[in-house]
Amino acid sequence: PPRSTLFPYTTLFRSMGKLQLPNTIKMVVTDFDGILTDNCVYINEDFTMSRKLNFKDIMGVHLLRKNGLQIAIISGEKNSAIETLAKKFKIEEIHQDIRIKIDVLKSLIEKYSLSQEEYVYIGDDVNDLECLNFAKYKITVPHAVEKLKSAEGIQITENNGGDGAFREVADCLIG
């Protein structure tokens, strides 16, 4: 969206529910389990694992991509559902089985020359804490661990992960 002609250097903020994010965001960096999923693993009869995705969140991914925003997924797990989602929506930045997420976040910031005003980080557990503390715009979900919900500057979605939280962020960003 265009910046104000009266105040060309003013960052405009969009609000949706509890969330407030600037119009300068170019990339959404997110965890997968607990944000795009309900944080549960389902064990099938053949001992394979499955995860549940909500169509509201999938539509959120679609809307962000359609509106030109980049999405990066940094997950502590390796999961074929991430690869399927990435392929369908042409998400290039997929980082799986990552133990120290902050290194990946910093490399994304450098690769895309992002300022603190140009990305938002979404996470739900202690392995996201370092990234959340580093980011200026940080979001978690209601079922996140307490340590995250009390982090300075954190915003909390109304919906849980895997139940519309990602869509809530997308709606806030695209208006």
Positions of the model-derived regions?
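Single conserved hydrophobic/aromatic residue that forms the stacking wall/gate
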Residues: P1-T11
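Active-site neighborhood of HAD-like aspartate-dependent phosphohydrolases
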Residues: R14-Q70
